[in-house]
Amino acid sequence: MALSSALDSLWHQLDQLLSLINRNIITGIIVLPVLYVLLKVIYNLYLSPLAGYPGPKLWAVSRLPWNRANMKGRISWKIRELHDKYGPVVRIAPDELSYTTSGAWKKIYGQRNPEFVKALDGRGIAPASIGGQRSLMTEHQDKHLRLRRAIDPAFSQRALREQESYFQDHSDNLVQKLKQRCKDGPLDMTTWYNLVAFDIVSDLAFGEPSGCVNNPDQPWIQAILARAKAIVWFQLAVQYGFMGLLNWMTPKYVTESRKKHIAMTEAKLKARVEAKNPGKDFMSYILENDEKLNHLELVMLSSNFIVAGSGTSAGGMSGLTYLLLRNPDKLEKLKQEIRGLFKSRADMTLQAVTSCKYLRACLNEGMRLYPPTPGSLPRFVPGKGEMIEGKWVPGGYAVGVNQLAAGHSERNFKKAREFHPERWLDEPDSEFKDDDRSAVQPFSYGQRGCIGRSMAYAEMSLTMAKLVWYFDWELDEPDNDWWNQQGTYLVWEKLPLQVKLTPVSDVVE
């Protein structure tokens, strides 16, 4: 009896002990994460090396506000708003600073040794590699320099002169198609600019046009455009470590579009390499270069040419078209330059159109207000840290210049939200003489800046000159705020831009 009573007492005590342990475990499960978050918040707000930088408190303690704005396609607009409120440097995440100054461009993107390496943890281009292969835009410094040496001859001024026929033929074809189609009503110029840009870069890359202007439903361009908005999901997955899950959950049309793009790139590349009498396209310079590339490197480079080469110029022309139509006095001034300078279509050479001062000013002003990449491509501060704009930033933190905010900043430009090409003309006593034009770098800056800058200017100059020469323009929906309602997904959303085109009757072919 005594033994039984003792055992009951022991079991009762054990039961109480287990209950106490369980309660403590449950309490710990609840309390410890809360305590961790609380300590993290306190650290980010008051103890972090970035604690002294201005910015919204919620963005300083968590990456989630950045993610939310990014997923909604409003990240560039939101960061512009933050710079308007807080100044030229803003803390936009617990471990990231955003800048809008020319000095930040020079330091972050221009410094070579040590280099500020690209942040490929989901803040910018994502994913960094596909199938283990990096692209020109995400490659490590030594490999990137090797690839640049291999392709530099293809983007030289000599190459550009030898490739003029590609630009002339495709811009002429665009004009003819627009003449045929404009009789039926307004045309979506966003689409047409993408089509002609794709034809030009495809012909330059492979010596064979893709036929997009002649066949607007061409599957290749549809495959690329289908991927544009998907990048925010890849950024989120890379940041929070669920790329495997995302790949499993990704809709079939997205994965198929990616596979289709690579397959078509490989097929075009194979045909070009095996061609008997190719013209002077990109590949002719690359294959003749002493810096030899393997097949996979050629495929990835070709993919970069197609995606980046077409998107930059098409976006630049779309933005400029809208801004000119919103500012008819500037459009009229451009008409006077183009129609006064050129007496016939034959006069419109690359050299001639790229020498048009007001046209060039319009292109620069268009890309200031509507930059091809409106956000930021952040870099990591190297080593133990660097001085940026007079303040020490420790190593390992992310920093970058936001293109949209920099171009729209009243600290950099007078009448910053207005379209004034005159600010780029270097006129004496100009009201814009104090503008910090170096704060705008639409093709990025430094050794990783866009290698196709001259090509893009040539393409945009020739195409826009011909459209101004051949047509009068009018917005179909003048009240439609096409620009401000566009989302940004690393690049612009590319909403339709409906324009009424009227052929000019007295042009000389």
Curated annotation (Swiss-Prot):
Compartments reported by the entry: Membrane
Keyword Metal-binding in annotation: yes
Residues that, per the record, bind heme: C450
Function, as annotated: Cytochrome P450 monooxygenase; part of the gene cluster that mediates the biosynthesis of alternapyrone derivatives. Alternapyrone is a decaketide with octa-methylation from methionine on every C2 unit except the third unit. All the domains in the polyketide synthase alt5 are apparently involved in alternapyrone synthesis, that is, the 8 CMeT, 7 KR, 7 DH, and 4 ER reactions in the 9 KS-mediated condensation steps required for alternapyrone synthesis.
EC number: 1.-.-.-
An example molecular function term from Gene Ontology annotations: monooxygenase activity
Residue spans crossing the bilayer: 25-45
Keywords from the named record: Heme, Iron, Membrane, Metal-binding, Monooxygenase, Oxidoreductase, Transmembrane, Transmembrane helix
Bilayer disposition of the protein: Single-pass membrane protein
Pathway this chain belongs to: Secondary metabolite biosynthesis
Top-rank taxon, per record: Eukaryota
Species whose genome carries this gene: Alternaria solani
Family from the record: Belongs to the cytochrome P450 family.
Position of the signal peptide: none
Pfam families registered for this protein in UniProt: p450 (PF00067)
Keyword Metal-binding among record annotations: yes
Protein name: Cytochrome P450 monooxygenase alt3
Enzyme class: oxidoreductase
